[in-house]
Regions:
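Amphipathic, Lys/Arg-enriched alpha-helical "gate/interface" segment within cytosolic domains
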Residues: 2-130
């Protein structure tokens, strides 16, 4: 299952992966949300928070995402998850092949706030009402 994280705002979108990720998650949630953000912003940044993640086959959905024309407007991806995901990212470089020009970084679960901060770094943030 994939859902959008409420802390998402502007050009920084977060998604929580929980359980099993399906190809329809790409088509009905991930891509439409990113395309909406791109309507208002030149580039977008993505946080992928992995929780209780049980299974995933990259398959057609992942391949379609890697070939998605809007991917050229993604400049940062933060992957937040357990130690197992850090190991996967180190041993499966092919997972992110096709992400040329995108800065992809791993953050442990206890550094979620740092991941959001890194994604928002350098962006103009409108002043908050007092």
């Amino acid at each position: 299952m994939l859902d959008r994280i409420k802390e998402s705002s502007g050009s920084v979108l977060g998604f929580r992966f929980d359980g099993k990720l399906s190809e329809s998650d790409y088509a009905t949630i991930l891509i439409p949300d990113l395309e909406r953000a791109m309507g208002d912003h030149q580039n977008v940044r993505i946080l992928l928070k992995i929780e209780s993640f049980r299974s995933w086959r990259p398959g057609e959905g992942w391949d379609a995402f890697k070939q998605w024309p809007g991917l050229e407007r993604v400049d940062r991806i933060a992957v937040v998850g357990g130690e197992r995901w850090r190991e996967w990212m180190n041993h499966l470089p092919g997972l992110f092949v096709g992400f040329a020009g995108i800065d992809v970084r791993y953050f442990p679960e206890n550094r979620l706030r740092d991941a959001w901060g890194w994604l928002r770094e350098g962006l103009l943030v409108p002043p908050q009402p007092a």
